[in-house]
């Protein structure tokens, strides 16, 4: 960036335009699948360096923000037209329940980056309106850490956040402590690994997870071991 700033900026323009176009094509492809399979996870690397110190000011320029809205809006429009649920999953370093204040602050910034993309697509105006931003509880503060973070998030981020049970850390029972505050995502494989239990469809906990979506179509994950 310091040695070739013009080349770096042009590369950013090229990458953001390419990734937005690719996302629209991906949503279009998923929209051709059977209704129960119409969910797509978009990558966190769509906009390079969005929360990185050297690039934050560049990304926050009004003209850049307007351009992002223009290129992401068609992605959301197509998702709604084809009834495709959009999903983001911030990486492992997004730890809203960390005991370290600086990590919590940077985690909120990272979460809001995903909320910005969802907002440009037209999502986040109401609770779980077609896009989710999914994280694990992760940090040592546990469910209470998530509750403490919620008021610090933008309205769109609060509408779209989901919490998924982890296979090593905070499990399904911890997630259920948040069922009245946000939507929950149950990963069957994570639960099987952590709790050594295959959860049945008629289990009351499954109903509670579904009810946390407040009438919206819920999402469920079935991960696999690496």
Placement of each model-derived feature along the sequence:
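Active-site-proximal loop/turn and secondary-structure-junction residues that shape catalytic pockets
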Residues: 44-48, 90-94, 137-141, 165-169, ...
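Eukaryote-skewed repeat-based solenoidal scaffolds used as protein-protein interaction platforms
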Residues: 104-184, 189
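Alpha/beta catalytic barrel-like cores
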Residues: 1-85, 94-108, 116, 121-127, ...
């Amino acid at each position: 960036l310091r040695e070739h700033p013009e080349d770096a900026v042009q590369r950013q323009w090229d990458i953001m335009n390419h990734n937005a176009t690719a996302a629209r094509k991906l949503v279009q492809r998923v929209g051709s699948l059977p209704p129960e399979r119409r969910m797509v996870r978009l990558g966190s690397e769509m906009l390079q360096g969005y929360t990185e110190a050297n690039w934050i000011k560049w990304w926050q320029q009004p003209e850049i923000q307007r351009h992002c809205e223009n290129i992401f809006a068609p992605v959301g429009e197509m998702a709604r037209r084809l009834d495709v649920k959009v999903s983001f999953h911030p990486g492992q370093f997004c730890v809203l329940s960390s005991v370290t204040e600086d990590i919590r602050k940077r985690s909120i910034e990272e979460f809001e980056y995903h909320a910005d993309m969802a907002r440009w697509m037209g999502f986040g105006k109401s609770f779980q309106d077609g896009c989710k931003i999914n994280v694990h509880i992760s940090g040592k503060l546990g469910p209470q850490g998530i509750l403490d973070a919620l008021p610090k998030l933008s309205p769109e981020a609060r509408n779209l956040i989901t919490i998924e049970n982890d296979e090593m850390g905070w499990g399904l029972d911890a997630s259920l402590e948040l069922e009245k505050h946000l939507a929950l995502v149950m990963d069957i494989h994570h639960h099987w690994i952590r709790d050594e239990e295959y959860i049945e469809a008629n289990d009351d906990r499954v109903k509670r997870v579904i009810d946390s979506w407040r009438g919206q179509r819920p999402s469920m994950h079935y991960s696999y071991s690496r």
